[in-house]
Amino acid sequence: MVSVSEIRQAQRAEGPATIMAIGTANPSNCVEQSTYPDFYFKITNSEHKVELKEKFQRMCDKSMIKRRYMYLTEEILKENPSVCEYMAPSLDARQDMVVVEVPRLGKEAAVKAIKEWGQPKSKITHLIFCTTSGVDMPGADYQLTKLLGLRPYVKRYMMYQQGCFAGGTVLRLAKDLAENNKGARVLVVCSEVTAVTFRGPSDTHLDSLVGQALFGDGAAALIVGSDPIPEIEKPIFEMVWTAQTIAPDSEGAIDGHLVEAGLTFHLLKDVPGIVSKNIDKALIEAFQPLNISDYNSIFWIAHPGGPAILDQVEEKLGLKPEKMKATREVLSEYGNMSSACVLFILDEMRKKSAQAGLKTTGEGLDWGVLFGFGPGLTIETVVLHSVAI
C-alpha cells in the first residue's frame, strides 16, 4: 500500500517555480502627463479652481511620469458625467465599464504570454486573476476562462481589492501552486483599470488628487511552473523565497473604500517614510541566508507607488541610481498600474538585459528582489534568481 508521504512526494515538483513567459497590454488611449492637468480640469468642469489646478500641475510635474494609458476617453467621460464629479453616486456606471474591460485587457496580456510560452493553452492547470478594479460574480477569473477558451476544470483563484502590493502576492501564490503540484502551469493575470478611481478634484482631499496624478491602466500576464521542459519552455526568472508582512505602526497609511462613488483612495500617513523604514528588515530576512548584504549587488524590482518612495528607499539603502532604472522607466512610461506594475518591470528588465547583451535576465546579476507595497501597509517580498541569456 502507498503511504501518504509517498503520495505527497510524487505530487511535488523537483525544481523551483520559474516564470516562463510575460505578456503586457494597455488601452489604446495614451495620455501625455504634461497636458493632463488641462484635460482633467476641463473634463471635470473644474477650470474655475485655479489654485487647485496649479497644485495638480505641480503634482504631475514631480511625478516623473511622461505618459499613461487609460480606458476612460473624453467621449466616455462626457457620456458619464457622474464619474467626473467628486463623490457623486456613480458605482453602477463604473461597474458597467470595468466588469467588461478588466477581463478584456487581461485576455490581451494573457494571449501574449501564452504565445511566448509556446505550449497549448490546454496545458494551463491553474489561473490566478487579480484586480482592484470593480467586483463581480462570477468573477473576472471566470470571464477570462471563457474569453480564452480554457478548460472548464482549470483551478481558479480570484483576488479582488488587494491594491498595489498584489503583484508580489500573485507571485507568492503561483510559486506555492507550481512547487506543490507537479506539472502545474499557472496563468497569472493582473488587470487594472482606473475607471473605478477617477473623479473630479476636491480642495479638501488632496490625497485623492495624488491618485489622479499617478494611476494608469494596464494588464500583465505570466506563465509560472516548475521543471521547465527542455527545448520547449524557456525560464526567465526563478522564484526562490517569498514573504508578506504588515509594517508596524502603519494602520491607515493607505486605504481604499468601495462606495457609491466608486473606489476612494486615501493616503493618511508618511508612506515613503514607512516603506523606507521597514525595507532594511525585509531585505535582511530575505538575503541573510544567501550571505548577501550589499544591496547594490542584486537587481531591483520595486512597486513604483510614486517617485518619493523610490527616492527614500535609494537614500536609506545607499543604492546606486541605476538600481531602480527599470522601475523608474515603467513609472515614466505607464504610471502606477497598481498590481500589474512589478510584472511590467520584470518584462522591462529581461528585455533590456537581452538588448544590452548582458549575461543574465537580471541586468547581468544572479540575485534580485521584487517588492510590492500597498494598503495595510503591506509589504510583499520575492527573492528572484535570474537565468542565463
UniProtKB/Swiss-Prot annotation:
What Pfam families does this protein's entry cite?
Chal_sti_synt_C (PF02797), Chal_sti_synt_N (PF00195)
Name the residues annotated as catalytic in the UniProt entry. 164
Cited Gene3D superfamilies: 3.40.47.10
Enumerate the Gene Ontology biological process terms.
flavonoid biosynthetic process; polyketide biosynthetic process
GO MF entries: naringenin-chalcone synthase activity
Q: In which pathway does it act?
A: Secondary metabolite biosynthesis; flavonoid biosynthesis
Q: Which residues lie in coiled coils?
A: none
Q: Which family does it belong to?
A: Belongs to the thiolase-like superfamily. Chalcone/stilbene synthases family.
> What's the stated role of this polypeptide?
The primary product of this enzyme is 4,2',4',6'-tetrahydroxychalcone (also termed naringenin-chalcone or chalcone) which can under specific conditions spontaneously isomerize into naringenin.
- Please identify the protein, giving its name as recorded: Chalcone synthase 4-1
Q: Which gene encodes it?
A: CHS4-1
